[in-house]
Amino acid sequence: MTISNPRPLLGCIADDFTGATDLANMLVRGGMRTVQSIGIPSAEVAAGLDADAVVIALKSRTTAASEAVAESLAALQWLRDQGCEQIFFKYCSTFDSTAAGNIGQVSEALLEALGSDFTLACPAFPENGRTIFRGHLFVQDQLLSESGMQHHPLTPMTDANLVRVLQSQTRLPVGLLRYDSIAQGVEAVRSRIAELRGQGVALAIADALSDADLYTLGAACADLPLLTGGSGLALGLPENFRRAGKLRDLDAASLPKVAGGEVVLAGSASLATNAQVDAWLEAERPAWRIDPLALAAGEAVVEQALAFAREQQGTVLIYATSTPEEVKAVQRQLGAERAGALVENALGEIARGLRDSGVRRFVVAGGETSGAVVKALDVRLLQIGAQIDPGVPATVSSGGEPLALALKSGNFGGRDFFSKALGQLAGGQA
């Protein structure tokens, strides 16, 4: 029997750009043809949609809670209008949020809009070292609050107890779905969820130590209208639709090849991106560093970077990546918000200038940076391809002249990610 999906099965709302790509990557790996929209799609996009899953990328992680809720509800309405059967709210595997939210408030609003009384919250991503045990989030062997995330310039995470963190962001009761229930399998999880619901719990942090735990959670939650978490929680969702006879049998990861120049743009200050920049510099490949203080002083940094790129024979790295200490020093002078905006805007302008000079393949490091770059390039829709590193797929833009992009969350990717991503975007091996 041939399965024809006139409408998407799974609708996803992500609170940042690279998080959306991370989730889309997971769904493609599971066999779902997936597209990612930058913001809520237009009517024109909706008319031509051919996907099993749609991921809407918002920029709602660090905005005011009221704004994040309004944007998320608008995205939910669009997804429901397309006929999506289940909704997934995606946030970072390190539970990135400000003291004011926004994970709890958005989850609460989505639950209410869907008329549901319960959902899970599980940011675990074991493949990338993010695990949850007794409600506490670990990054590799470190508690979240000791992992380096406590120094994040926008969303410092100083508490690893996710039940406590989430409860501070919502009026709804928060509980814990512990590892011992999950280890007993799908029916035990369903039974424990029923108990939690009976106790009035509306949001439950779910432990997860392995991918097997995530598959168990996915299967147990097949009938929940809403799921929330990191991309790892989506591991088991494609199989739910396949088991129900709703998923098409096709190569979900196929992408067209894109010819043209290439560049690496890095704005993240994370440990992983710092290591990736160091690897590039150690290989003595051409690189240009953006100085936020020079930007603030009105110097022609964008023009200088573009001139540098034009003069080089090989692929260049243009980066604002710095150590946490350097970032804090700049923020003391400029303020965190202004410093971030200056760098994002500059990298966006540089990306646009490079595109105009023939660059067609972009490797971008950092969630905020990726958002600025896709906006500057006027990318509205991405086809999602094969994985480069855990959480990071190759993508190609739809509409207009195609661009190949690898949009990486700051903390993702191995030390050799830049060269590996360039190789995959070019259609070969790094």
Curated annotation (Swiss-Prot):
Residues that hold ATP according to the record: 268, 366-369, 410
Superkingdom as given in the UniProt entry: Bacteria
Keyword check for Lyase: no
Keyword list, A-Z: ATP-binding, Carbohydrate metabolism, Kinase, Nucleotide-binding, Transferase
EC number per UniProt: 2.7.1.217
InterPro entries in the record: 4-carb_acid_sugar_kinase_N, 4-carb_acid_sugar_kinase_N_sf, NBD_C, NBD_C_sf, OtnK
Single GO molecular function: ATP binding
Reactions this protein catalyses: 3-dehydro-L-erythronate + ATP = 3-dehydro-4-O-phospho-L-erythronate + ADP + H(+); 3-dehydro-D-erythronate + ATP = 3-dehydro-4-O-phospho-D-erythronate + ADP + H(+)
Family matches, as NCBIfam families: OxoTetrKin
Function: Catalyzes the ATP-dependent phosphorylation of 3-oxo-tetronate to 3-oxo-tetronate 4-phosphate.
Similarity-based family: Belongs to the four-carbon acid sugar kinase family.
Protein name from the UniProt record: 3-oxo-tetronate kinase
Record organism: Pseudomonas fluorescens (strain ATCC BAA-477 / NRRL B-23932 / Pf-5)
